[in-house]
């Protein structure tokens, strides 16, 4: 599968939460047509990252990780680095950053999209 095909499919079925997400989706669609290397972080104009919101089994707690570089708490995430399956990217980042081994995605598409 074309590495950007899944992202294009997500964008076509994604329902924006608000006007800003709608505008961001339009910009991302445009960039997908114009930029060949959106999966690589060396694209300084724009590139894809993926993150995950990790819940406990009862869904009443969320995992936050302390980011030493930025000196702040955040959810897990990272750069696509050439990988077009952003769910896989998000899952890989959670495992690397948290040490969790067993993960079960609740959704197979994005919760939010932003630039």
Please state what every model-predicted region is:
Residues 2-6:
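Non-transmembrane, interaction-prone alpha-helical and coil segments associated with secretion
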Residues 7, 31-32, 38, 73, ...:
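Generic signal for short, ordered secondary-structure residues
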Residues 13-51:
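Acidic, metal-coordinating catalytic segment for phosphate/diphosphate chemistry
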Residues 29, 50, 74-75, 112:
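Charge-rich, low-complexity amphipathic helices
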Residues 42, 111-115:
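Acidic pyrophosphate-coordinating catalytic loop
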């Amino acid at each position: 599968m074309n590495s950007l095909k899944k992202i294009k499919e997500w964008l076509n079925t994604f329902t924006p939460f608000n006007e800003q997400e709608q505008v961001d989706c339009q910009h991302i669609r445009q960039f997908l047509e114009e930029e060949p290397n959106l999966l690589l972080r060396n694209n300084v104009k724009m590139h894809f990252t993926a993150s995950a919101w990790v819940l406990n089994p009862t869904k009443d707690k969320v995992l936050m990780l302390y980011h030493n570089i930025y000196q702040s708490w955040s959810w897990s995430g990272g750069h696509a680095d050439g990988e077009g399956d952003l769910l896989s990217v998000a899952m890989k980042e959670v495992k690397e950053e948290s040490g969790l081994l067993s993960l079960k995605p609740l959704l197979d598409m994005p919760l939010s999209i932003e630039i």
